[in-house]
């Protein structure tokens, strides 16, 4: 036995050794050697030691220059060959003779000029891709031996004409892409036109020559216009006739035609050709003889037209764009061409508003070409191309509309059947939709491949056939039809007659009930949202509370739709419970996702169906990060492409990260405290209003002896750069439609806080309604990095609308559209937009003009103004915050002007991105070097919790955590003063005096009418911070007067914080102490080590019963603070973890090698907030060097601005002349291919955009997810060089 085992080990090792030799070191291979990928390996030839059994060979992105027959010898089973993105210039004739089974060939993105015959006998080739080469000539025999060819791509080459017999004998051809070639539309083009009328194509084929047909679509040209020339001269010599063809100076080889076929392929015999002359037998019928030619040089049509223009003249259009429609997410290219002398300048307008070149809307060829990607709803509308010179001006308007896509609708679904053992059955599933849906079949939640044993799915996916039925085949079969805008599922049950009886199934929920439930859920949510929207139209916004609700509709539309989809999904699940006898009741100690299961009620196929019906398959657009130059240098606005390995890390509109798994009452979505009277660890959770009143509220405050109020304000500014949790859009219950604050029932999205009879608001009679209104945070379907079609019900997650990086997104915005709204588009100077300036000539934030947001608190006020517009929607929340935002728009514009003066060759795009990069570095430096050591109580304690910077780590997830955003970083509420100080130049109160906090909310007019930003800034750096004492936590302005308006129930910030943490499913304070490796209290006596005040412990005990019930935010703010710090160890742990990951996981961190030059970094490290105030205040001349430290009230304690160090921008002089091609106004502009976050569903497996794979049991096929569709051929549907095709 031992000898046998030894021989077995030796044999196995030997096999592994031999197998290893069959996979070259430059390649990756599957275990059987059937799939070999040698991409991006620097190869100059095809490796010799590849297994000859290989079925799929990918050698993309290498340096191969020539393809020889000998390179492919022996690959008798090869079905897919991908050689894209090489340097191939030559391929040998009949190169495919050694590949008898080849079905897919891609030679796209090479340097081929001539294509010779590819094989000498018949081959089963189905797909041929020659896209993006330099092809001018294609031999007539190239396609002769491919009767099975279905897909052909000759696009983006230099083809002027094709041989007339090239397309003969191609009975299976269904797709041909011939666009983006300089076609000569002569008699030869009639065969191309005929082909286009038979097959499907991607884009229209346009004529380049002759001039009279230029820019006309070939399929629209009349056949009579597709002609070749009659011979110019005829002469007879004996038995011969000489014919001469006229030829112009730009033409090259003349082509002679006989009966509209090239003479060398025609029935004509005995001819001789000498340049422009052909000699034919005298008996030839010369009436059938014509000639044509191709051109040596094809001048770009724009330059050609301009060369025809003589003398001075006003602009004239030579090509006008036409009205057109495009699908959502597609790339749009529009040409607008003019001539005139002097050369006209072209300007572009969208819905009457001028725009300049940007990442979203790129202008090329001196603004002649407009490219938009991705084309979304906000891009549709009326566009105007305007051409201006000193002689005159012309304008042309046209419309670009969005083609509405239609989600799938299954009109013929599978039917439940019974069948005997050994029999067979066919399930049918057919759906309408636009684009055409793809189909995925599953059995009891497990995906069925196209060919899987006894299971077979038809080629179009509409039929599932099961043969030789066994008892184990009994169960539910589900069909999912999906396209980029939605999905729909239908299922049926197979009952097998005979054999052992299967376990009784759970109560049934059929497809009809699911569809009705989803429709009712959508109606409930949509009605509730619409009611709220109507109530908050501009003429009904009468107070700041309404204003905050209206802000919800100003968040990006994408965020609105993502959160709405999840709400519909959850409402659907709630309605399902109403139809099921068995509810879901779990013990408190079972509140953990892995224990949950709505599957006890909902089958996995039903979960998938509800996800599709609710819209939970959609997601945010995903950037493939192919513009390596730009993404190496600059951040994207939404955070994508920061982490090259995980490009969606830290991106806006993504779920908050979890430190601990959430705790929901039902394990799915309902917060703890949702079910009234429920006990937790033997005690009911306290009413959060009572926690606020008894424990958190304080009428007395103690000023901090060392720190200024700027500590608080910078903290809020940083928070608004990192976190913004989107709230529910509706104030109405989805289930009943009741107004949220009219009832204290917990009905989504309402999670209101009842007021007790002894509440001061009730006793005083000021409470108009019985509870404080609270709407839950909007939920998000999923992250998109894995599957959005979950195999089980997933717990509720909340969305961060901002990027998680410290990147000045509160200045510039967290998406492309928002960023463009903030830019000055009328001048190409890289500056931010402003509308008015102060008396000192310095900019104020621009006014919000294009939405219903309005900051008028009292409509009877004189000169009411609209909201200020900034990168964060909350810029108007209070006056000091608006002043801080103002400083940063001024700083951006100050730097932009200096960079422009030093670098006259820079355009606005370069100036903007370089300035944005500098301002982002300023925020990072001030936060980490000046502010954070203060809040942690010193550099040593900061290093303990945050650590020192060791360089960028791509494995770090910088995403903001739910605990940080919802609880820990809200420690800042304990250091807010009840008033905003406003100090004049003499450091005395201005004549209007200080302002109570509740009067400072959403009042931007006071910035303009009461002294500008200077009094507010002095009030921050020259007033003391509120000391966060455990017995003095939140001042009464925040407890009783938050967003107060006379007759309404004002909010309570402590209540909001505690209720929000429950809404988000945050575990208790003790669980986070355990996470942080801190002592965990079991009894109340255990807490005396870190809560020194016995009275506080007694209050906690009276409210919570046991330490295990304490809410995280409450426990965190009453903890004993770190020495000289502003919070205790639990919050220090959570905040430290977050700021460490924000820094270490940021590829653009300002201290990372290569982000800035050493000289630039030295200058950035000189930056202080004091210097920013000096440079950008209206008249700030005295200030302390460290604005976070409070020197006292005496003006003499403040130094002069001359004493603060300045940053020298000379380090940026000519630093960036070598800019990325995508930032230049040239024809060389990358096409920023993106996609939708939801990716592709293939065989039930969800794959992210850009993923590539070999389907199981289909070795000959190689697939890529592109544009939310699965492409399983060598046809290239985009130029993204990550594609395997």
Curated annotation (Swiss-Prot):
Q: What class of enzyme is it?
A: oxidoreductase
Its recorded reaction(s) are: L-lysyl-[collagen] + L-methionyl-[collagen] + H2O2 = [collagen]-L-lysyl-N-S-L-methionyl-[collagen] + 2 H2O + H(+); bromide + H2O2 = hypobromite + H2O; L-lysyl-[collagen] + L-methionyl-[collagen] + hypobromite = [collagen]-L-lysyl-N-S-L-methionyl-[collagen] + bromide + H2O + H(+); L-tyrosyl-[protein] + bromide + H2O2 + H(+) = 3-bromo-L-tyrosyl-[protein] + 2 H2O
* Gene field: pxn-1
Alphabetized UniProt keyword annotations: Calcium, Coiled coil, Disulfide bond, Extracellular matrix, Glycoprotein, Heme, Hydrogen peroxide, Immunoglobulin domain, Iron, Leucine-rich repeat, Metal-binding, Oxidoreductase, Peroxidase, Repeat, Secreted, Signal
Site positions (Transition state stabilizer): 874
What Pfam families does the record tag this protein with? An_peroxidase (PF03098), I-set (PF07679), LRR_8 (PF13855), LRRNT (PF01462)
**What is the species of this protein?**
Caenorhabditis elegans
Domain (LRRNT): give its ranges.
Answer: 21-53
Specify the Ig-like C2-type domain's residue ranges.
Answer: 315-401, 408-495
**Cystine bridges: which residues?**
336-385, 429-479, 625-641, 740-750, 744-771, 1076-1133, 1174-1201
- Give the glycosylated residues: 49, 248, 595, 741, 858
Which amino acids does the record list as binding Ca(2+)? 721, 803, 805, 807, 809
Residue ranges for the region (Disordered) are 305-324
The entry's family comment says:
Belongs to the peroxidase family. XPO subfamily.
Annotated cofactor note: Binds 1 Ca(2+) ion per subunit. Binds 1 heme b (iron(II)-protoporphyrin IX) group covalently per subunit.
| Residue numbers annotated as active site | 720 (proton acceptor)
Q: What is this protein called?
A: Peroxidasin homolog pxn-1
Places the protein is found: Secreted, Extracellular space, Extracellular matrix
């Amino acid at each position: 036995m031992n000898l046998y085992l030894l021989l077995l080990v030796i044999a196995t090792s030997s096999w592994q050794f031999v197998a290893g030799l069959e996979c070259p070191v430059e390649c990756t291979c599957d275990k059987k050697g059937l799939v070999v990928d040698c991409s991006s390996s620097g190869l100059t030839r095809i490796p010799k030691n590849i297994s000859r059994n290989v079925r799929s060979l990918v050698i993309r992105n290498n340096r191969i220059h020539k393809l020889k027959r000998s390179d492919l010898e022996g690959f008798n089973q090869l079905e897919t060959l991908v050689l894209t993105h090489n340097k191939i210039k030559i391929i040998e004739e009949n190169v495919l003779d050694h590949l008898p089974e080849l079905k897919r060939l891609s030679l796209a993105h090479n340097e081929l000029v001539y294509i010779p015959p590819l094989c000498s006998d018949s081959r089963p080739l189905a797909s041929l891709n020659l896209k993006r080469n330099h092809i001018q000539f294609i031999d007539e025999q190239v396609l002769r031996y491919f009767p099975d060819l279905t897909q052909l791509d000759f696009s983006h080459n230099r083809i002027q004409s094709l041989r007339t017999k090239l397309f003969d004998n191609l009975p299976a051809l269904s797709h041909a892409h011939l666009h983006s070639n300089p076609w000569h539309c002569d008699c030869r083009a009639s065969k191309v036109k005929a082909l286009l009328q038979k097959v499907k194509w991607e884009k229209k084929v346009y004529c380049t020559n002759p001039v009279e047909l230029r820019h006309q679509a070939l399929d629209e040209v009349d056949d009579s216009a597709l002609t070749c020339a009659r011979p110019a001269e005829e002469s007879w010599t004996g038995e011969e006739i000489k014919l001469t063809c006229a030829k112009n100076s730009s033409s090259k080889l003349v082509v002679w035609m006989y009966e509209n076929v090239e003479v060398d392929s025609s029935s004509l015999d005995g001819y001789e050709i000498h340049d422009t002359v052909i000699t034919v037998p005298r008996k030839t019928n010369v009436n059938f003889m014509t000639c044509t030619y191709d051109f040596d040089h094809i001048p770009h049509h724009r330059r050609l037209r301009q060369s025809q223009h003589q003398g001075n003249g006003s602009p004239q259009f030579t090509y006008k764009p036409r009205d057109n429609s495009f699908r959502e997410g597609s790339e749009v290219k529009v040409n607008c061409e003019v001539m005139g002398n002097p050369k006209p300048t072209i300007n572009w307008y969208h819905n009457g508003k001028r725009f300049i070149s940007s990442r979203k809307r790129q202008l090329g060829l001196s603004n002649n070409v407009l490219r938009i990607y991705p084309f979304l709803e906000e891009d549709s509308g009326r566009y105007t191309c305007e051409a201006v010179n000193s002689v005159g001006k012309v304008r042309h308007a046209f419309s670009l509309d969005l083609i509405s896509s239609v989600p799938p609708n299954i009109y013929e679904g599978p039917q439940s059947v019974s069948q005997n053992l050994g029999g067979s059955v066919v399930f049918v599933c057919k759906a309408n939709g636009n684009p055409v849906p793809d189909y995925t079949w599953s059995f009891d939640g497990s995906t069925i491949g196209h060919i899987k044993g006894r299971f077979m799915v038809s080629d179009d996916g509409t039929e599932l056939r099961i043969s030789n039925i066994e008892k184990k085949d009994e169960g539910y079969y589900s069909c999912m039809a999906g396209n980029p805008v939605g999905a729909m599922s239908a299922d049926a049950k197979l009952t097998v007659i005979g054999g052992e009886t299967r376990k009784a199934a759970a109560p049934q929920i059929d497809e009809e009930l699911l569809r009705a439930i989803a429709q009712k859920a959508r109606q409930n949510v949509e009605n509730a949202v619409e009611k709220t929207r109507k109530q908050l139209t501009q003429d009904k916004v009468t107070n700041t509370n309404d204003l905050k609700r209206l802000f919800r509709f100003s968040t990006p539309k994408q965020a609105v739709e993502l959160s709405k989809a999840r709400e519909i999904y959850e409402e659907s699940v709630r309605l399902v419970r109403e139809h099921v006898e068995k509810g879901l009741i779990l013990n408190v100690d079972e509140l953990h996702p892995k224990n949950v299961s709505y599957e006890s009620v909902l089958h996995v196929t039903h979960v998938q169906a509800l996800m599709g019906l609710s819209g939970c398959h959609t997601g945010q657009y995903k950037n493939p990060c192919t513009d390596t130059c730009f993404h190496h240098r600059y951040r994207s606005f939404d955070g994508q492409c920061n982490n090259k390995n995980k490009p969606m890390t830290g991106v806006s509109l993504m779920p908050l990260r979890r430190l601990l798994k959430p705790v929901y009452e039902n394990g799915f979505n309902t917060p703890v405290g949702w079910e009234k009277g429920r006990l937790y660890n033997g005690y009911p959770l306290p009413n959060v209003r009572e926690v606020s009143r008894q424990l958190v509220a304080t009428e007395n405050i103690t000023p901090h002896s060392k720190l200024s109020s700027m500590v608080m304000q910078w903290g809020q500014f940083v928070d608004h750069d990192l976190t913004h949790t989107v709230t529910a859009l509706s104030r109405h219950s989805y289930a009943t439609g009741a107004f949220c604050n009219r009832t204290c029932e917990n009905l989504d999205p309402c999670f209101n806080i009842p007021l007790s009879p002894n509440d001061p608001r009730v006793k005083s009679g000021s409470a108009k309604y019985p509870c404080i209104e609270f709407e839950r945070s909007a939920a998000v379907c999923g992250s998109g990095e894995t599957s959005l079609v979950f195999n089980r019900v997933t717990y509720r997650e909340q969305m961060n609308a901002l990027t998680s990086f410290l990147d000045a997104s509160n200045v510039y915005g967290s998406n492309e559209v928002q960023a463009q709204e903030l830019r000055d588009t009328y001048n190409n100077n890289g500056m931010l937009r402003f509308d008015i300036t102060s008396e000192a000539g310095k900019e104020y934030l621009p006014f919000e003009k294009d939405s219903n947001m309005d900051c008028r608190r009292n409509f009877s006020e004189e000169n009411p103004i609209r909201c200020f517009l900034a990168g964060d929607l909350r810029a108007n929340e209070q006056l000091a915050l608006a002043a801080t935002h103002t400083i940063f728009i001024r700083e951006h514009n100050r730097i932009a002007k200096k960079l422009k003066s030093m670098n006259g060759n820079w355009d606005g795009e370069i100036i903007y991105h370089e300035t944005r990069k500098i301002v982002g570095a300023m925020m990072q430096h001030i936060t980490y070097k000046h502010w954070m050591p203060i809040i942690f109580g010193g550099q040593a304690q900061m290093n303990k919790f945050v650590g020192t910077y060791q360089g960028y780590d791509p494995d770090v997830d910088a995403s903001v955590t739910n605990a940080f955003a919802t609880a820990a970083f809200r420690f800042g509420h304990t250091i807010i003063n009840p008033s905003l100080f406003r100090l004049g130049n003499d450091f005395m109160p201005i004549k209007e005096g200080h302002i109570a906090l509740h009067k400072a909310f959403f009042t931007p007019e006071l910035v303009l009418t009461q002294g500008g930003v200077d009094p507010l800034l002095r009030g921050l750096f020259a007033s003391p911070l509120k000391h966060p004492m455990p017995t003095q936590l939140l001042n009464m302005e925040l407890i009783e007067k938050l967003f107060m308006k006379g007759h309404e129930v004002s909010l309570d910030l402590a209540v909001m914080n505690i209720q929000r943490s429950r809404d988000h499913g945050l575990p208790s304070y003790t669980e986070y102490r355990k996470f942080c490796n801190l002592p965990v209290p079991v009894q109340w006596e255990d807490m005396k080590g870190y809560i020194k005040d016995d009275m506080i412990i007694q209050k906690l005990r009276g409210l919570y019963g046991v330490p295990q019930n304490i809410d995280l935010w409450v426990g965190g703010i009453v903890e004993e603070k770190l020495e000289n710090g502003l919070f205790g160890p639990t919050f220090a742990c959570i905040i430290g973890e977050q700021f460490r990951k924000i820094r270490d996981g940021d590829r653009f961190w300002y201290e990372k090698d290569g982000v800035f030059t050493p000289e630039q970094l030295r200058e950035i490290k000189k930056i202080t907030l004091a210097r920013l105030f000096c440079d950008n205040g209206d008249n700030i001349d005295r200030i302390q060097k460290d604005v976070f430290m409070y020197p006292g009230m005496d003006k003499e304690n403040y130094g002069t601005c001359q004493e603060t160090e300045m940053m020298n921008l000379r380090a940026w002089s000519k630093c960036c002349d070598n800019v990325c091609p995508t930032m230049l106004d040239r024809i060389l502009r990358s096409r920023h291919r993106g996609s939708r976050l939801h990716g592709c569903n293939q065989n039930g497996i969800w794959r992210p955009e850009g993923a590539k794979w070999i389907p199981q049991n289909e070795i000959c096929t190689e697939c890529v997810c592109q544009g939310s569709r699965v492409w399983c051929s060598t046809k290239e549907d985009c130029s993204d060089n990550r594609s395997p095709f």
